[in-house]
């Protein structure tokens, strides 16, 4: 992935 873990965590949160 090209996104850092922080972004992934945020996406998971909003998902």
UniProtKB/Swiss-Prot annotation:
Which molecular-function annotations from GO does this UniProt entry contain? prunasin beta-glucosidase activity
Look up the domain of life of the source. Answer: Eukaryota
- Catalysed conversion reaction: (R)-prunasin + H2O = mandelonitrile + D-glucose
Q: What class of enzyme is it?
A: hydrolase
Post-translational modifications reported in the UniProt record:
Glycosylated.
Keywords, comma-separated and alphabetical: Glycoprotein, Glycosidase, Hydrolase
EC?
3.2.1.118
Q: Does the keyword Glycoprotein apply?
A: yes
Give the transmembrane ranges: none
The UniProt entry's coiled-coil ranges are none
**Subunit structure, as described in the record:** Monomer.
Q: What is this protein called?
A: Prunasin beta-glucosidase 2B
Upper classification of the source organism reads:
Eukaryota, Viridiplantae, Streptophyta, Embryophyta, Tracheophyta
